[in-house]
């Protein structure tokens, strides 16, 4: 998955290569590869949940469980990057997410991730996506 980034003049820490590597790990559906990019105290705010921020998952072990569960539930899931903008510490990425479930169903929707980085690791992943009705 390639980040089609617009460079921000303030960009010092975050690189397109790092964001692309995170995306590649997710697209490989490889939980160990994904988790190497998360800080131990990272948080993940899911798009859905009872709170304004959705359901919040705290800590790398909890986040690992969330994504491992996704990878186990589907044959594969792929995020196609539609656009990505970087600042010094944040990546704002638009995706087309397609999941092929083991029962033969395909799920597709548009999503946005806001990834906040510190020292080369994700400290906060905030996800938004379109709801079909």
Identify the residue ranges that each predicted region occupies:
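Short, low-complexity N-terminal intrinsically disordered segments enriched in polar/charged residues
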Residues: 1-40
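A beta-strand edge to alpha-helix "cap/lid" segment located at domain peripheries
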Residues: 6-14, 64, 68-133
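Residues at structural and domain junctions
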Residues: 8, 20, 28, 49-53, ...
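Generic signal for short, ordered secondary-structure residues
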Residues: 12-14, 20-21, 42, 46-49, ...
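Acidic side chains
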Residues: 27-32, 45, 113, 126
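A solvent-exposed, acidic/Ser-Thr-rich amphipathic alpha-helical stretch
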Residues: 31-82, 86-88
């Amino acid at each position: 998955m390639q980040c089609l980034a617009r460079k921000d003049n303030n960009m010092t820490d975050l690189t397109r290569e790092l964001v692309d590597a995170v995306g590649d790990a997710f697209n490989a559906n490889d939980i160990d590869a994904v988790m190497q990019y998360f800080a131990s105290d990272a948080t993940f705010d899911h798009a859905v949940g009872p709170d304004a921020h959705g359901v919040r998952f705290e800590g790398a072990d909890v986040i690992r469980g969330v994504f491992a569960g996704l990878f186990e539930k589907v044959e594969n899931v792929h995020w196609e990057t539609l656009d990505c903008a970087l600042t010094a510490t944040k990546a704002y990425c638009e995706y087309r997410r397609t999941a092929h479930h083991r029962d033969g169903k395909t799920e597709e929707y548009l999503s946005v991730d806001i990834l906040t980085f510190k020292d080369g690791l994700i400290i906060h992943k905030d996800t938004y996506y379109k709801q079909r009705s």
